[in-house]
Every structure is written in structure tokens, then in C-alpha cells.
Amino acid sequence: MSGQAKPTFYLLRGDDTTRIKEIIVGFQAGLGDPSMADLNTTRHDGEALSFETLQADALTMPFLADRRLIIVENARAFLTKMAKDRTQTCLDLFENLPETTALVMVVEDQQAKKRGERYWEHGKAYAWLTDWMREHNDR
């Protein structure tokens, strides 16, 4: 790994699915050899993902590589089904992700405008995460 720590948590939010896919392809390319990148990339659908599965994957060491990539598509479903008493446990995981893990949450959402103010249409459903991100923008 290089001297500077790489971020371990990414939130890709919006409705530009083409751009989101391009960013994810870039993350995968950053893993190096494509065959090793495939071995070190895990994709989940947030609708079916449990916290325990995410935690196990996030803490697994990469195989013959510096990093592993975990992509959670439809992450809004995962984030909104998180019981209030589990959100802190989830944030603790995000806060303590090993440098060998890059966790990417993909949240399809749209910006809307009300009284001249822009906001995310579904932002309240996962505000606990975006609040944490504002406080921990170094992760």
C-alpha cells in the first residue's frame, strides 16, 4: 500500500446510473489484475443483505491483493431496514473498516427542490449515515 491511507467507505448517491457504473469500474480497475479483482470483489443487493453478511465480508482479508471491494447495490433498502438500535453497530463497522476494504454503498436517489432548497428525496431514510459522514469525512 502507498504511504497515504485510502478511503474505506464510499457513498455513491444519485440517479445517474451510467456514471455510478463508471466509478465502480474505476474502483475495480484500481484493484489491479482483472482476475484478482474479480476474486476480491463482492456484490450484494441491499434488499437481501444482512448486517452479519456485510460485516463478515468487510472484515475478510483480500486474496493476493492489497484491497478488496464490496459493492452494495440498492443500499437504500439495506440502510432503511436497519433497526434504530443497530445503526450505531453499523456505524462502528464503517468507522473501523480495515484499510484493505473499500465498501461502496450505491443509493439511487434524486435531488428535488422545495422553496428554493435542494434536498435528496429519500435522504431522511438514511440521514443517520449522511450525518455520520459529515462528521467523519476522512473515512
Regions found by a protein language model. Name each.
Residues 1-139:
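Conserved beta/loop motifs at nucleotide-recognition and modification sites
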